[in-house]
Amino acid sequence: MMRCPECSTEGWRVLPLTVGAHVKEGLWSKIKGDFYFCSLESCEVVYFNEQTVFRKGELKTRVGVKEREEPKPVCYCNRVTEKMLLEAAEKFGKEKAVEITGAGKGKWCVVTNPSGRCCHWHLERLGFPVGGEKKAAKRVEIKLDGLTCMGCVSAVKAALEEAGANVVEIGLDRAVVEVDEEAELQKLVEAVEGAGYSARLEKR
């Protein structure tokens, strides 16, 4: 893990694919290696690594958690904003608001969401429940083969989630997922193979 050079918040790793989807095209030449995402609301830094820092003004995408005015995107896959959630919560309650808006139900987060993750962390920060999920008991690393683009990554991520895994990290050659203790790990391999790629398991 690395800490943001401006606010010292611990960042989480994001793929070059994610960074490239949100940073302005003129800055693509600076995208080298993995970056880290800073989630602190008041910090202007979005992505950073040892060599490069990208701030809000250098992105073409609004980073909802860092915006002070609407629209404040929360679920990028289903185009759900903070305002939409709050309005639905006022009428139907927070739990129903998540269901009605479809927040947290997307499958392309690694590309659409600047954080490179599902928006569940953002929903929880706003006080919305993301219940119904089982707590993961173990973390598993999956070696991947045959992926060549962000479309491949998104397809494998969706397949793993359909198999019941919580995808923590994913790239062209590996994925790290969390699953229940009783989960059949071979089903994860089968899910990747069903999406048209090769995989093998390595417990962490």
From Swiss-Prot:
Domain of life: Archaea
Cofactor note: Binds 1 [2Fe-2S] cluster per subunit.
Molecular function terms, GO-annotated: 4 iron, 4 sulfur cluster binding; metal ion binding
Pfam family, one: HMA
Keywords: 4Fe-4S, Chaperone, Copper, Cytoplasm, Iron, Iron-sulfur, Metal-binding, Zinc
HMA domain mapped to chain residues: 138-200
UniProt keyword Metal-binding, yes or no: yes
Binding site for Zn(2+): 4, 7, 38, 43
Sequence positions that bind Cu cation: 149, 152
One GO location term (cellular component): cytoplasm
Binding site for [2Fe-2S] cluster: 75, 77, 109, 119
InterPro entries hit by this protein: BFD-like_2Fe2S-bd_dom_sf (IPR041854), Heavy-metal-associated_CS (IPR017969), HMA_dom (IPR006121), HMA_dom_sf (IPR036163), Znf_CopZ (IPR040890)
Gene3D superfamilies: 2.20.25.270, 3.30.70.100, BFD-like [2Fe-2S]-binding domain
Localization of this protein: Cytoplasm
Requisite cofactors: [2Fe-2S] cluster
UniProt-listed SUPFAM superfamilies: HMA, heavy metal-associated domain (SSF55008)
Subunit-level organization: Homodimer or homooligomer in the presence of copper ions. Monomer in the absence of copper. Interacts with CopA probably in its Cu(+)-bound form.
Function: Chaperone that serves for the intracellular sequestration and transport of Cu(+). Delivers Cu(+) directly to the transmembrane transport sites of copper-exporting P-type ATPase A (CopA). Probably has a redox function due to the presence of a 2Fe-2S cluster and could reduce Cu(2+) to Cu(+).
Protein name: Copper chaperone CopZ
Species this protein is from: Archaeoglobus fulgidus (strain ATCC 49558 / DSM 4304 / JCM 9628 / NBRC 100126 / VC-16)
